[in-house]
C-alpha cells in the first residue's frame, strides 16, 4: 500500500516526482505540505478510524474531507474503484490506461465527473 495515498492517488505515477507520498515522513511535496499541521486531512481521518485508505470507509461516497472537498473528483473516483476492485486491479488498470496513451493522473484531473472516470477505468477490467 506504500505507493497508494490514503485518498486513492497512486504515488508511482504522480507528476510530483520528488514527493515520497503521504505515507512517508517527508511531506514536503505532498498534499500534506499545504497544511500548518503538515498532515493530510485524508490521512488524519484514516488514522483516526484505523483505515488503510479512504476506500475502506463507509462514508466515502459522501465524504468532503481533504482532497474530496477541493474538487479532486479523480481522487474520489480512484478510491471508489479501489473499494470495488482492490488496489492490485487499480494498479494494473492504470498500467493498461498508460499503455493506451492516457496521461495518468493529469488527464483524469481534467475530468470533473466521477462516474466518467470510473467508466474509463472499468472499461479496462
Report each predicted region and the residues it spans.
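Cysteine-centered metal-binding/redox modules
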Residues: 1-125
